[in-house]
Amino acid sequence: MMKYLAIALMFLLAPVIVADAQESQQNYEIMKLIRQEKFDLILPGALRDNNVDMWIHVVESGRMDPLALDLGGWTEYRAWEPVCYYIFTDRGGDRIERIILGGEDLDGFYDIEGSSHDLLQIVEERNPDVIAVNMSESLGIANGLSHTSYLRLAKALGTRFTERLVSAENVITDFRVRRVQREVAAFAHILEIQRQVMEAALKRIEPGVSAPEDIGWWAADQLLAQGIGPSYQAASLFLPYMPFSYMPVESADGVFQRGAFIMWDMGVGHLNLGTDIKRYAYVLKENETKIPAGLQRAWDNGQKAREVLKNTIKVGRTAGETHDAILAAMESAGYVSTPSDDRTSQYRDLMKELGDSDKFGFSVDMHTTGNTSVGDAATGPQMAPWRSDRAHLVIQPMHIFAFEFEFNAWIPEWNKRVSINFEDNAIVTHNGVEYLSPINEDIIVVR
């Protein structure tokens, strides 16, 4: 399977010259193909594996639903239809029946198109035992059903069918995390563009001249030229694009100074996909010809730890089981667990306890990515001590995630213990963990 993916990526990443090529049309056709493949290949298992007969996804007119690009159709600004029902029913066979009520099927994906007032008739004719709807206590993208829409739904269905309602969070989770080949190829393509832009941007730093925003805006322009924007939904779209002096020198007068260790955490969004990676650079001091020995030692051992982690993550385990296996493997290799169960000061406190010893501490945050950058918003298993609500989820084949871990070490030249947060994006297959783009193997040196 991965052999064919590799071949697809070769063609995808190679320069292609097409007369009068239209990028907008290309993006539309890619999204359409992914949606079709997900409906045909992923949706049946997402319902059947969770013992769901019917999935009703409720969308209010004028509100952007988290699954809008996954499901397609037109639901916005339809004053005559204040609510839209996407209805997916398992009626046997090799496909799931697809119905849209109160919206418009623009691409021919749905078998039946009608009014939202037809809901009860549709449900009665199919008489499902279990009806999953988009309400959830813990998963934001599966909780788009507002209170008023729930009341409207319950009134339309009546007590008989309302009593059969369950959360669709498991259906939505499986529908999202089970990937089709074109989805993975698109993600890898976007990720590689981002990686090249970030690394090129860091190499442009002029000590004492370049400010973080100079580098950030340049990178933003390069990405936007290819139609790629940020995936973090921040108040300022500029926020994800700014690198900063991580250690030990602050940016005097707002520019990068010599001796600065720079960290850059960025996520980009495109084609209903979101990335999340980090890159590091070091600005040599006037009398330096290479990275300080203490920092290089920490980095090299972090790369060794990466291999231990990479060999521990397998398909078929739950996130919780995987986290336990990671702790055992890392501690067996001589690393000290310095976790944070509450995402506050616990990690820093444990790190300080190691002081100036030669020991290396670590904590992991192997969170899902793929459709969004941040694990808190993404579906799927999360391997992190503070993400226990996702610990029961099983790592499935083609699981895309942020290969992220914090690694701390004493740096003699700086007289302090420093934490380095490694992060690249990867996929788990039956072969193990595979990176979707070249990793941050070396610190970028700025002279």
Feature names for model-found ranges:
Residues 6-15:
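Bacterial N-terminal signal peptides
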Residues 20-447:
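Active-site neighborhoods and metal-handling regions in enzymes and metal-associated proteins
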Residues 1-5:
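Positively charged n-region of N-terminal signal peptides that target proteins for export
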